[in-house]
Swiss-Prot record:
Keywords for the protein's UniProt record, in alphabetical order: Cell projection
Localization annotation: Cell projection, Cilium
Pfam families with a match to the protein in the record: LLC1
Gene: CIMIP5
GO cellular component: cilium
Keyword Transferase: no
Record-linked PANTHER family: CHROMOSOME 20 ORF85 FAMILY MEMBER, RIKEN CDNA 2410004P03 GENE
Name the UniProt record assigns to this protein: Ciliary microtubule inner protein 5
Top-rank lineage group of the source organism: Eukaryota
Lineage: Eukaryota, Metazoa, Chordata, Craniata, Vertebrata
Species the sequence originates in: Homo sapiens (Human)
Disordered: annotated segments: 1-44
Length: 162
């Protein structure tokens, strides 16, 4: 037996109450037990979205919508600052190819028509634009004959109601 606790079993008092473990089990990560690499809180002490649900419940109302909004604004501002830094430091690279030769800018046409002659301008025309072709006419004819049995038919005179 000895004085060393058995791994996997919790300590209890003589009255049957469970005592907290003297050290956390090895299966618990350092971040979860609050070690040196514990997750840092974000703006206003609010945890990151991937934080454990238990931590969010323990924090209570500290992680409300206002703090989430503030966090979002800070993240957007950091993104904008990163874009500005890239423009200042690295934007010259977009004017050169991988071999270091200066790229020629593409010449744009003087006039671009608003509507295309070959591509329909709406979804309905996409369906209807190909029905005037010989293949479209053949498909219409085949569809008409294949669905003939499913169509409503006029009853014969003797089957008509009086």
């Amino acid at each position: 037996m000895g004085s060393h606790p058995t791994p996997g079993l919790q300590r209890t008092t003589s009255a049957g109450y469970r005592l907290p473990p003297t050290r956390p089990p090895a299966s618990v990560s350092p971040a979860a037990r609050g070690g040196p690499m514990a997750s840092r809180g974000l703006a206003g002490g609010c945890q990151a979205p991937q934080a454990l649900k238990a931590q969010r419940v323990a924090q209570g109302a500290a992680c409300d919508g206002v703090q989430q909004d503030q966090l979002w604004r800070e993240l957007l501002e950091a993104e904008r600052r990163g874009q500005q830094r890239w423009i200042q430091n690295w934007s010259f690279l977009k004017d050169y190819d991988p071999m270091g030769n200066k790229k020629e800018p593409e010449k744009l046409p003087d006039h671009v028509p608003l509507f295309s002659d070959t591509v329909p301008s709406s979804t309905n025309q996409v369906v209807g634009s190909r029905l005037d072709t010989p293949l479209g006419q053949t498909l219409i004819r085949m569809d008409f004959f294949f669905t003939e049995g499913a169509r409503k038919k006029k009853l014969e005179d003797q089957m008509q109601p009086i």
